[in-house]
Amino acid sequence: MDFHSCLYDIAERLGNEELAALKFLCLDHIPQKKQESINDVLVLFQRLQEEGMLEEDNLSFLKELLFHISRRDLLSRVLKSSPEEMVRELQVLGKAQVSAYRVMLFKLSEDMDKEDLKSFKFLLITEIPKCKLQDNSSLLDIFVEMEKRTILAENNLVTLKSICFRVNRSLLGRIDDYERSSTERRMSTEGGEELPVSVLDEVTIKMQDMWDSPGEQESESLNSDNVYQMKSKPRGYCLIFNNNNFSKAREDIPKLSNMRDRKGTNYDEEALSKTFKELHFEIVSFSDCTASQIHEVLVSYQSKDHKGKDCFICCILSHGDKGIVYGTDGKEASIYELTSYFTGSKCPSLAGKPKIFFIQACQGNNFQKAVPVPDETGLEQEHVLEEDSSSYKNYIPDEADFLLGMATVKNCVSYRDPTRGTWYIQSLCQSLRERCPRGEDILSILTGVNYDVSNKDNPRNMGKQMPQPIFTLRKKLFFPPN
């Protein structure tokens, strides 16, 4: 097979995703500007020939590219090279033509799943314009944008490491391997020159800035002073109030005559039960409770001895309005009163321990609409944020160690799919199952839930939904899976 037939044969067997991977791996040889007109593999091969990277008597760079994108079939069948030969060749100092840095980034993109990618994009919102972080943007696209803005480079992995630390800590292993091998290569070529100061301290500080309040300049180690203990088994009680049948409310209260049953709520109960059981909580479920029954149950758990437990969780799935949830009888139960049963004075055995409430209920009748997000933060946005945060001051006690996860902001509706469950609870459970094993804290997880739910649209009225976490936690809260 002649040279051009060989290239044509390879190009015919490579898809669009593989073309994107090849272009990324070639960035050190073909700059981004010159790559803009490359829309198929044959054009890429032409550019490589122009740059002297691809010649009839020298196919080493092409072999290396196919090796890195795991097209071993083309490597062996068309180019007559085995993966073992490539491994041996690339171990020879100076033989590799694709930088270890770029290979590391490419492999990182292969390691990251869709949920990781979604979180990665969210954490870059302040660094990269939202138009560059659309759903169809791949991680390779984002790496290119990060490089353009000088927040990612061969000698600058601080932002990358800090985000990977939050999204999925297992990703750090590949970066650490790259840094270690890079150091070894540098020492071997520079005769043992003294190593530069590690960037680890800078990474730690950056991660701390992302987690804590502005102005803190020193990282903290994770210990009992800044992390809630979560070792007991069971961790604590997880109460689930699942209200579905509102026929009594329709009969007894005229203004609620149009209140519907909550079809699909059982999917939420199942998801919550499964999720928190996996996280070692003792699940106790209650179906179709009146307002007084909800109060009675919480009073009974207020009086229980929680000394051997590290946490308390209460989930309420019901209809609601501003500051209240409805019992199935249509009577109102104040969210503030429900959470206040577990203050330190009323429930001493839970003092200093996290008390968590997840409320899936509307908080009004307004529909949230999509609005453009400006690239720059302004005074108006700060004002809105201030109002949003202050409007919830009476939902939880003025006391430490409470977390309230609301499905929606004040005055607005939340959405439930009769065949799948609610947007909020389903996203919450999926995020907890995926991210707790990675060592993420609850506030990071809830931030991801906000991002996920806020990107959904109600097809009937294009309504949006924005969950609202409210908390007085003093420490980081993790739910270890073991």
UniProtKB/Swiss-Prot annotation:
DED domain boundaries: 2-80, 100-177
GO MF: cysteine-type endopeptidase activator activity involved in apoptotic process; cysteine-type endopeptidase activity; death effector domain binding; death receptor binding; endopeptidase activity; identical protein binding; peptidase activity; protein-containing complex binding
Propeptide, residue positions: 1-218, 379-388
Gene3D superfamilies reported for this sequence: 3.40.50.1460, Death Domain, Fas
Top-rank taxon: Eukaryota
Gene Ontology, cellular component aspect: CD95 death-inducing signaling complex; cell body; cytoplasm; cytosol; death-inducing signaling complex; lamellipodium; Noc1p-Noc2p complex; nucleus
SMART domains per UniProt: CASc, DED
GO biological process: angiogenesis; apoptotic process; apoptotic signaling pathway; cellular response to mechanical stimulus; execution phase of apoptosis; extrinsic apoptotic signaling pathway; extrinsic apoptotic signaling pathway via death domain receptors; heart development
Record family assignment: Belongs to the peptidase C14A family.
Encoding gene per record: Casp8
Keyword Protease tagged: yes
One family name in Pfam for this protein: Peptidase_C14
Catalytic site positions: 319, 362
Protein task: Thiol protease that plays a key role in programmed cell death by acting as a molecular switch for apoptosis, necroptosis and pyroptosis, and is required to prevent tissue damage during embryonic development and adulthood. Initiator protease that induces extrinsic apoptosis by mediating cleavage and activation of effector caspases responsible for FAS/CD95-mediated and TNFRSF1A-induced cell death. Cleaves and activates effector caspases CASP3, CASP4, CASP6, CASP7, CASP9 and CASP10. Binding to the adapter molecule FADD recruits it to either receptor FAS/CD95 or TNFRSF1A.
Locations listed in the record: Cytoplasm; Nucleus
Phosphoserine found at: 188, 213, 390
Residues carrying Phosphotyrosine: 336
EC number of this enzyme: 3.4.22.61
Regulation of protein activity: CASP8 activity is restricted by RIPK1.
Xref: InterPro entries: Caspase-8_DED1 (IPR033170), Caspase-like_dom_sf (IPR029030), Caspase_cys_AS (IPR033139), Caspase_his_AS (IPR016129), DEATH-like_dom_sf (IPR011029), DED_dom (IPR001875), Pept_C14_caspase (IPR011600), Pept_C14_p10 (IPR002138)
Class in the EC hierarchy, top level: hydrolase
Site (Cleavage) location in chain: 218-219, 376-377, 388-389
Subunit structure: Heterotetramer that consists of two anti-parallel arranged heterodimers, each one formed by a 18 kDa (p18) and a 10 kDa (p10) subunit. Component of the death-induced signaling complex (DISC) composed of cell surface receptor FAS/CD95 or TNFRSF1A, adapter protein FADD and the CASP8 protease; recruitment of CASP8 to the complex is required for processing of CASP8 into the p18 and p10 subunits. Component of the AIM2 PANoptosome complex, a multiprotein complex that drives inflammatory cell death (PANoptosis). Interacts with CFLAR and PEA15.
Catalysed reaction, written as an equation: Strict requirement for Asp at position P1 and has a preferred cleavage sequence of (Leu/Asp/Val)-Glu-Thr-Asp-|-(Gly/Ser/Ala)
Primary location class: cytoplasm
Post-translation changes: Generation of the subunits requires association with the death-inducing signaling complex (DISC), whereas additional processing is likely due to the autocatalytic activity of the activated protease. GZMB and CASP10 can be involved in these processing events.
Protein name, entry field: Caspase-8
